[in-house]
Every structure is written in structure tokens, then in C-alpha cells.
Amino acid sequence: MLPALRRGARAARRRRTADTPPTRRLATPSFQLGRLNHVALAVPDLAAATKTWAALGATVSPPQAMPAHGVTACFVGEQLELLEPLGAESPIAAFLARHPAGGLHHVCHEVSDVAAAARDLERRGFRVLAPPSIGAHGVPVVFLHPKATHGTLLELQEASGG
């Protein structure tokens, strides 16, 4: 192989490795990943999105501003969350800059103890984006970097009984 091609191939392997979920210490976690809680969609216009879902026959909750997360959220039924940015610094604003029409933002699963799960995941090489904080349902949540979960932003939410 030509030297330039070998260098390119090595660089490509390094990039793939950097974007690959952690493989070291993938021992059994100290927690159980629970049920799917919700799927979240980023939307550029929450009012328009809620009208669409209502026209489809869905029950839509009133919008709820969540300044700590930089979003306004509402729920469609029990398992679909619509997210609109609360200002230019919102992570949803950054998402919409890359995906102007909106789309799938994250998937949320329940765990019994978010703080313990976050500590365990960090210890085993997963990248937790921020310390646990209170989410839309009034319980602790934490997000894992999408590079650690095959390209999907994963939210872990403390189960209500947990």
C-alpha cells in the first residue's frame, strides 16, 4: 500500500476508535437498565408541533419551560416528548442548527438510582455529559454522550418508585 494510503487508513482507524463506545471494563453494570420511558423529538416550533400531534388524535400536555435544561417541553401521550429551545444557548438550538426540520433527539430509559448509574458508567469509561439534574418529571436524569451509545443520545431517568 502506498505510504499516503497507509497514513489515511491509520487516521481512519483512529477516528473510528475515538467514536466507538468504550470497550474497556465492560463488566456487568451495578444497575439494571429499566423500561423505555420516552422518546424525545427536537422541534423548531412547539406550537405547530403540538397542533400536528393533536390533529393526529394525541393527547398533548401543556408546555413546560425548563430553564435548567434550556428547553420548553411538552408530552404527547405518555412516551413522546417534544422539545423546543429556550434561547440560543440551548442544546436543542444547537441540534436544530444541524437539523433545521427537527427530529429524534434522545431516548430515555429508567434506572432505579441515576446517581449510582452515572458513577458506575463513568467508572467503566462511558462519558456522562453532566451531573444528574432534575428533569421534566421532577426526578433526576443524566445524559450519556452519543459516541458512547452508537450515535444515540441516551437519557437515564430515575424511576418514580426508585
Label every model-predicted segment.
Residues 4, 13-14, 19-32, 43-62, 68, 72-84, 86-87, 99-147, ...:
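Vicinal oxygen chelate
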Residues 22-48, 102-111, 160-162:
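N-terminal beta-strand motif that seeds the catalytic metal site of vicinal oxygen chelate
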Residues 36-43, 53, 76-83, 92-93, ...:
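Short, structured motif recognition centered on aromatic/hydrophobic residues
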